[in-house]
Amino acid sequence: MAISIEGRIARSPNVCGGRVCIAGHRVRVLDVVVWHEHQGMSPDEIVTQVPSLTLADVHAALAYYFDHMEEIREEMQAERAQAEEFRRTHPLTA
């Protein structure tokens, strides 16, 4: 398992599908990025929504993102493609 940002960010093949996450939690860096960058949540609001996280955890996740933007954006794109494929192969029926 690889750990960085003062032990707050980890990657393990058995946790979150091997995606980078906040150590000790099943919250991916990608989740924090979506909440912050796409839903407009402040770090304080994220901690309020996920009280098991600390403000330092959220800031570490954002710091990791800003240092590894391409990696996280590729994960985001892969998830979008996977969701689109699922919608295509499992259409809604009335």
Task: State what each model feature region is.
Residues M1-R19:
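Basic, low-complexity segments
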Residues R28-A94:
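Long, charge-rich, low-complexity alpha-helical segments
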